[in-house]
Design a protein with these regions (language model features):
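Active-site neighborhoods and metal-handling regions in enzymes and metal-associated proteins
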Residues: 1-426
Length: 426
């Protein structure tokens, strides 16, 4: 049975078992669901579950808490408690149905469940014999202990705690076959939508964003994975430009950083193309320089290469420096490369766009790691740089799954060769 698209109840149980195995004897992990966030007044944002909570439970509702306790030495020796809202027909008439306590056991396979409204009396007994608590639940706010911190202190003031995130990073960073399949589908849909956008002329950044948001959803994604960058002309030199409200100039390039989400897994793609559909000579020269660098980085996303993301970044810097020098850039000037390429070449991806926060880029890439490779060049409009490249911003990004001997590009449907981009409009 699938609890979320592509991910079975058994896979969620296996994840909990691996977490428990990572804890010391009688260690306890405590996770809180994300809160519903409000835009203004009573107007709320679409709900997004906290990623570690979702990874371990598949439960996509607020006002919930999960407790996982190691009970023995064998894989699978753990107890899973899931505290949720009880069914409430009157409240559900307003908000829509929620799962309730029985479903927490019958559907989400909790060993024990309870009313989240009674958590202050239900949680402390579970912590009394714990050897250590692993949690990222907030312990203080505005200098004062939170309700959760007081619950822990009521059990044992000397009970030690540690962050859960480092353990979760080690579990989440290597993707399962099911996770990779979800990311491949997200990449396939997103890539096709971006290619479809390249086929059409656009007058404004806003219209282009609206097209992508719609087509991601209409073609099977849950929606956009993040607020996209749609940056025409020199606005592409602002790495995270998301105003997306300016007119597009047919003589310039447009940079689009966008992707859809499928089964809560994301695609992360950047493409840059001429608004007119045809590259000028200068646009083509700079674009192809970045593309050569990007291809080099993607080719290193294999376990047999023995590379890290930091290592690929160094290769990218060296290759890009040579490419830009050949185009007439003064790369001997101190700080020139850092100004033209100010960000890292890649990051981990998965449930989050920047997945597994804190997991090092110095770690050797292994089969199952999923990363982005995204070199870019952002040329300021000033006399230190060749006149025909000034104001151009170009980035090319793919989502890539590391395999043993070759990379699996998850976003290959988004075309990136000059000949393919220009052929889209005949």
């Amino acid at each position: 049975m699938y609890l979320t698209p592509g991910i079975t109840a058994q896979e969620y149980a296996d994840r909990r078992a691996k977490l428990a195995q990572s804890l010391p004897d009688n260690g306890v992990a405590v996770l809180a669901a994300a809160e519903l966030k409000y835009r203004s007044g009573a107007v709320f944002y679409p709900y997004r579950q906290e990623s570690n909570f979702l990874y371990l439970t598949g439960f996509n509702e607020p006002d919930s808490m999960a407790v996982i306790r190691r009970t023995g030495d064998k894989l699978g020796d753990y107890v899973f408690h899931l505290f949720v809202r009880p069914k409430d027909p009157k409240a559900e008439q307003w908000s829509g149905p929620w799962s309730g306590l029985q479903a927490a056991q019958d559907v989400f396979n909790a060993d024990e469940t309870g009313d989240i409204n009674k958590i202050e009396s239900l949680l402390p007994p579970l912590l009394r014999s714990a050897s250590k608590i692993y949690t990222d639940v907030e312990l203080s706010r505005a200098g004062q202990p939170t309700k959760f911190a007081n619950m822990v202190r009521s059990v044992n003031r000397s009970l030690s705690s540690a962050p859960l995130q480092p353990i979760m990073n080690n579990l989440r960073v290597i993707k399962s076959k099911a996770e990779i399949a979800n990311m491949r589908l997200a990449g396939q849909i997103s890539g096709r939508c971006i290619t479809a956008a390249m086929r059409r002329p656009w007058d404004t950044e806003k219209d282009l964003q609206a097209f992508l948001d719609y087509t991601f959803t209409a073609n099977g994604c849950e929606g956009p994975a993040y607020v996209p960058v749609v940056a025409g002309g020199s606005r592409a030199n602002m790495i995270h430009y998301v105003h997306n409200n300016a007119a597009l100039d047919p003589a310039q390039l447009v940079l689009v950083d966008a992707g859809g989400e499928y089964g809560t897994y994301i695609a992360d793609i950047t493409r840059t193309w001429p608004v007119s559909g045809k590259f000028s000579a200068a646009q083509r020269d700079l674009y192809e320089a970045v593309l050569r660098v990007q291809r080099t980085g993607v080719a290193l996303c294999r376990e047999s290469a023995g590379m890290t993301l930091d290592g690929i970044h160094r290769v990218t810097e060296n290759t890009l420096r040579d490419q830009l020098r050949d185009l007439g850039f003064d790369m001997g000037r101190a700080g020139a490369l850092d100004e033209l390429f100010p960000h890292h070449v890649g990051h981990y991806i998965g449930l989050d766009v920047h997945d597994c926060p804190g997991y090092g880029r110095h770690v050797a890439l292994k089969a199952g790691h999923c990363v982005t490779i995204e070199p870019g060049v952002y040329v300021p409009d000033d006399e230190r740089f060749p006149a025909h490249f000034r104001g151009m911003g170009i980035r090319i990004e793919d989502s890539v799954c590391v395999d043993d001997d070759s990379p699996l590009v998850l976003t290959t449907e988004a075309v990136k060769e000059v000949v393919d981009i220009e052929a889209l409009r005949g």
